Amino acid sequence: MIDVNSFNALKIGLASPEQIRSWSKGEVKKPETINYRTLKPEKEGLFCEKIFGPQKDWECHCGKYKRVRYKGIVCDRCGVEVTQSKVRRERMGHIELAAPVSHIWYFKGIPSRLGLLLNMSPRALEKVLYFASYVVIDPGETSLAKKQLLTETEYREYYDKFESQFKKGKGFKAMMGAEAIKELLKELDLEALTKELRNDLKTAKGQKKVRTVRRLEVAESFRKSGNKPEWMILDVIPVIPPDLRPMVQLDGGRFATSDLNDLYRRVINRNNRLKRLLNLGAPDIIVRNEKRMLQEAVDALIDNGRRGRAVTGPGNRPLKSLSDMLKGKQGRFRQNLLGKRVDYSGRSVIVVGPELKIYQCGLPKEMALELFKPFVMKRLVEKELSHNIKSAKRMVEKVRPEVWDVLEEVIKEHPVLLNRAPTLHRLGIQAFEPVLIEGRAIQIHPLVCPAYNADFDGDQMAVHLPLSAEAQAEARILMLASQNILNPKDGSPVATPTQDMVLGSYYLTLENTSDFKNDAYFSSPAEAVMAFRQKDIDMQEPIAVDVRNYEKKDFSLPENNKPSDSNLLITTVGKIIFNEIFPEDFPYVNGEKPGLNEYDWLKSGERIEDKLKQREPREAIQKGSLGDLVGHCYRKYGSTKTASILDKMKEVGYSYATKAGVTIGITDVAVPEKKHEIISDAEGKVDEVEKQHHRGLITPQERYTRVIDIWNNAKDSVTGAVMDNLDIFNPIYMMATSGARGNISQITQLAGMRGLMADPTGRIIDLPIKTNFREGLTVLEYFNSTHGARKGLADTALKTADSGYLTRRLVDVSQDVIVREEDCGETDGVEVGAITNGNEIIEGIGDRVVGRFAAADIRDRQGNMIVNRNELITEDAAEQIQEAKLDQVPIRSVLTCKTKNGVCVKCYGRDLATGAVANVGEAVGIIAAQSIGEPGTQLTMRTFHTGGVAGDDITQGLPRIEELFEARKPKGLAVISEIDGRITVKTEHNKRKVIVTPEKGEQKSYNIPYGARLKVKDGDEINAGDEITEGSINPHDLLKIKGVRGVQLYILQEVQKVYRMQGVDISDKHIEIIIRQMLKKVRIEEAGDTELLPGSYVDFFDFEKVNERIKEEGGEPAKAKSLLLGITKASLATDSFLSAASFQETTRVLTEAAIKGKVDPLIGLKENVIIGKLVPAGTGMPHYRNIDLAYNDEENEAQSDKSQDEQEIGEITVDMGE
C-alpha cells in the first residue's frame, strides 16, 4: 500500500493500453464466475484465483499449499500464489478486445472531446462508431475529402472504381467503427494543429471563434499533458478487483452479485463471439454487427444509459455501471471517501442532566465499557488483575465486578465527543468529560442544547472516542463544551440559559411596586435575605440595603455610579440572591444591564416610596439580558470562569423556577372586556367601507386595503387590551415577557383574537378570525386558519432540504480558504459604513468594524487618533467611532486580501468563536459556510403577497440568498443607470422613458417596463450603477458598470438585508469570504504573448503571476475581464479535480481532468479527506506537523507530557482572559 503522507500531489491522466496491461495480473478469458457445485471460482473467469489471488488467506485453489509457512509460493498445480486474501481488493485483470472500441466519456461528453479533436460533429462520429457509415481515411485519387462520410452504396461504388489501388494498400481508403477513428487520431499532429488553430483565432468571429477556442483547449490539453489522442480508443479493458464487485451467497442458496459482473460478462461473451467469427472468416455484415454490440457492451460497462436505452437487470432496473459507482450521494466519493463510519462510536437517546457541570456528560455504563474496552483491558493487565490480554478480554465480556473500578480510572480525563445530526455548524460536535451513569440514555447539560438545537422529545446523539494523545489534547483544549461558549457566526454567546432557567431568573428578579407595604431598610444583604427566609418581606418587594456590609460586591466600580453621600441601595431580595452568581468585581445587576444609576441610590432623609414614584420599576432579567450578561462575563473573565458562572446561573434558574411554582390553567387566559367593543367598532367601520364600495366611490383594491388596515388596527388594540388585563404574576404573561416560551402574539391568539389569515397563495383573506382559542373558533374560521397551518408545515419540510443543499454548496466553494499567513501586505481596504434601510439604521458602524484591523489611521472629526493603521479595532475603539459619528471607516477586508489559496490574519481580523485574533491555520472558509448555512432554516421560503398589491414580488428569504450566491439574473429585475448624470422622465405613446444626461458625453435612455415603479424623480442626480426602478439588480450588469468592488459590496449588503429581516446576525466577514471565492477567476480576452487561451477561466493570482513573468521578459501581457461565478460554478472551477468531482457532475469533471493530465495540489480540506491525509488546517498544517520532539528518558517523558498539557491549558485560559 502507498503511504498517504509520502506524496504532495495527485495526477490523473488517460491510461495507455500498455499501462492497463501492466496493472493486470492476467487476462480474463471466460465469462464464468463461480462453479455452482464447488462454489470455487472458475479458472480464467471473472473471479479467477490465479489472476486475482486466493479466496482464503494462505491457501491455494487446489489445496496443495495451506498455512502461512508457504507464503509467496506459486502452486505448481493450480498456479495460485499463496498470500493473503485481501490482495483480491487490489489486483486487477484485463480483457483483450478483438476490435478497438471508443470510450463513451470522450465521445458522448459535452462537448464531445473526440469531435473537437477531429473537427467532426458528434452525429457523424456516432454514425462511424456504431457502423452506420464509412469515413474516408485517405481520399487517394478520388474527389472525396478526408473525414467525409460515405454510405454503404457510395462506398461500394468507390471501392469498385479504385479496387486496384485499394488492394495495394495505397490511395483510397475508408473504414468504419472505432478502428477508423483510431486511425484518424493516430495521424493527428498536435503541434501543427495548435499552431493552425492559434492562427485561425486571430481572424475568427462569433460561433466560429467559440468552437476554435474549444478545439484549441482540447488540443493544448493533449499536447501539454503527454496523453495520446488514440488512447481515447480502447484496445484493452481493465477488470477491477473481484472484492470490489463481490458475489455473495444468500440464505436461500441463490447468489447476489454486483451489477458490474453482469456488465463484464456481456463484454466477455460478445468479445469471445467476435473472436470466433473473425477466426471463421464470417461475412462482413455479421462481424460488423458483433463489433457494434461489443461497442455497446463496453459503453454500458463504463457509463450505462449515457447513449440509448440503459441495459436493465431483473425487474427493469438499470444496471449500475462504473460511472454510477462514483456519482451522487451513494457513490464512492460521497458515501465512502468523504463520510466513513467509524469504530469506537455509539448512539443513544438523550435526557437532561441538570446536575452536570457544563463540560460533563452522563455516559451509560454499558456503553462506556464497550467504547473503552481496549483501554480497560490494557489497564487490567497493568494492574495484574489478569495475566494477558486474552483473559482480560474475557473478564470484560463477562463483566466482572472489578472491571467497573478499572473503567472509572480509565475514563478519568479522557474526553468523548458528542454529535447530534444534522450537524449544521461546528458546535454540533463538542467534547465532554464522561460521568458514568446507570440507565441506557446519555445525559447532556441543558446549556449546550441551543448549540446542538437539541430537545428531549426523543432526540438521539452519537458518541465518539478520541483515541490518540494528540486527539485527546485537541478535544480537551479546543472542543470542550466550556470552550465553545460563543457562536462563530456573530460572536454572541450560544450557551445561554433557556426556558425554565429564564423563567426562574425572571421570577427571582421581578420588582413588584403595585402593593408596596412599608419602607424596609436593612443593614446588610445577609439581614435582608434572613428577613425574606422568615417571611417578613417578599422576594419582589423593593427594599433598601446598606452596601457597606456587602462583602461579595465591590461598589467602587465606575459602572455602579455610587454617590459619595449615599450607602443605601434600592433593590429586591431576589436581585441580591441573583447577584451572588457573579464575582465581586462584576457590576451589580439591578436591571437589564450590569451597573446602577442615580435612581437606585437612596440619600439620607429620602423614603423608598418617594424614590419609586420618580422612576419606572427596574426591569426583571429576561432571556436577552441573560445572554448579554454571559457575553459580558466572557469578555471580562474568559471561558473557564464564564463556564462556572453559567453553571451557577443554571442552578439559580432551576431552583427558583421550582419555587415560583408556575402552572398554567384555563383561568389564566383572561379575555378582556374591551375586546367585544373593539370588534364591533371595527365591524362598523368595515360596513362603512363596503357601502362606499357598493356606491362605486372606491375601487375593489382600495376597499381591500382599507379593510385589511381596519382589522390590523383592531388586532393591535385587542393585543393592548389583553396585555393590560394580565397581572404581572400571571404565568402566561411571565413566560412570554421573560422570553422563556411563547410570545405576545400567541397570548393575543389565546385571549384576544386570531386576526387575519393568509390563503394558500399567500394573499391575506379580508375576513378575520374574530374569536380566540379560549372562546373557540367557528367552523368557517377554523377552515380559514387551516391554510396557514398547512403551508407552514409544507414550507418547513422544503426549507430544510433547500437549506441543507445551500450549505453543501457554500462549504464546497469555500473549503480551501484557510488563514495561511500573518500579513499579506495589502495596503488597500474597504470603506465600511452603517447598514441602513431607508432612514432606519439596521446595523451601526461600530458593530460592523469591531474585531477588524484598520486599513488606515482612523481619526475623529477633530483629528484625534482613534486607531492606528493595521491595529485591531476593539470594543472601546468601536464605541468611539460610533460616538464620533463617522460615515465611513477603512478596514482591512478578506475582499482585498492578497494571500493565495486563503486569507491572512490582518485581513480576517478576530476569530468570533474565541474573541481573540484568528490563528494561522484556522479553517475560516468552512466556518463562513456554516455560519451562513446554519440559519438558513430560519429564513422564510416563498414570497408573501401583501394581498394583490401591484408590482412584481421581490424574492425574499432563502430563494433570494440562493439567487445572490448563484449570481443569477434576479426575478423582478431593476433597470440601472450605466452612467452618472441627471434624470429626465418622459412619456411617449403610453410608454415611460428615463433619460440620463451626463455632464460630458452622450446621454442614455432607458425604457421602463409596464407596471414597474420608479425610484427616481425628474431632475434627480444619479450615479452609475444606481437603480432607476424598484427591484433587484443583476449582479453581472453591476460588475460591468461598477467593477469588482461595487458588486462585492452589493452582494454583501443584499445578503445581510435578508438575514437581518429575519433577525439573524451574521458577521460580514463570513459573507465576504464566499463573495471572494465567487470573484476569484478572470476570463482571458486577449492572450498576448502568454500561453493562456482566450476565453479560458484563470485564477486571478495565477493570471497576475503569468503577466509579471511576461513583462519581465519584455513580451505583451494578456488582458482579462473579472468574472462573477455562482457558487456551484465556482466550486466546479476549482484547481482540485478531487474536490470538484466529489461535488457534482462527477463524470464531466473527471473526463476533463484526465485529458488535461491535471495535478491536484491537495490544498483544500476535501481532497485531503478523500485520500486520507490529515487536513491542512489547524494542527494539520505543515509547519505544525514538522515539529520533532526529543525526550531525555522515560520518566521525563511522562512528566513533560503532563506538564505540556497543563501549560497549554494554562496558556489558553490566560489568552482568553486578556
Curated annotation (Swiss-Prot):
Citing just one GO molecular function, the answer is: magnesium ion binding
Q: Which SMART domains match?
A: RPOLA_N (SM00663)
> Where does the chain cross the membrane?
none
**Cellular component terms (Gene Ontology):** DNA-directed RNA polymerase complex
Sites where the protein binds Mg(2+):
D455, D457, D459
Which keywords describe this protein according to UniProt?
DNA-directed RNA polymerase, Magnesium, Metal-binding, Nucleotidyltransferase, Transcription, Transferase, Zinc
Q: Name the cofactor(s).
A: Mg(2+); Zn(2+)
- Report the InterPro entries cross-referenced here: DNA-dir_RpoC_beta_prime, DNA-dir_RpoC_beta_prime_bact, RNA_pol_asu, RNA_pol_N, RNA_pol_Rpb1_1, RNA_pol_Rpb1_3, RNA_pol_Rpb1_3_sf, RNA_pol_Rpb1_4
Cofactor binding description: Binds 1 Mg(2+) ion per subunit.
Documented EC number(s): 2.7.7.6
GO BP annotations of the record are: DNA-templated transcription
Identify the domain of life. Bacteria
Record flagged with keyword Nucleotidyltransferase = yes
Protein residues bound to Zn(2+) 1:
C60, C62, C75, C78
Q: Which Gene3D superfamilies match?
A: 1.10.132.30, 1.10.150.390, 1.10.1790.20, 1.10.40.90, 2.40.40.20, 2.40.50.100, RNA polymerase II, clamp domain, RNA polymerase Rpb1, domain 3
State whether keyword Transcription applies: yes
In this chain, the stretch annotated as Disordered covers: 1195-1218
- Name the CDD domains on file: RNAP_beta'_C, RNAP_beta'_N
Q: From the UniProt record, list the reaction(s) this protein catalyses.
A: RNA(n) + a ribonucleoside 5'-triphosphate = RNA(n+1) + diphosphate
The record's family statement is: Belongs to the RNA polymerase beta' chain family.
Q: What does this protein do?
A: DNA-dependent RNA polymerase catalyzes the transcription of DNA into RNA using the four ribonucleoside triphosphates as substrates.
How does this chain assemble? The RNAP catalytic core consists of 2 alpha, 1 beta, 1 beta' and 1 omega subunit. When a sigma factor is associated with the core the holoenzyme is formed, which can initiate transcription.
Task: Read off the NCBIfam families from this record.
Answer: rpoC_TIGR
**What's the name of the protein?**
DNA-directed RNA polymerase subunit beta'
What is the native source organism of this protein?
Natranaerobius thermophilus (strain ATCC BAA-1301 / DSM 18059 / JW/NM-WN-LF)
Q: List the top taxonomic levels of the source.
A: Bacteria, Bacillati, Bacillota, Clostridia, Natranaerobiales
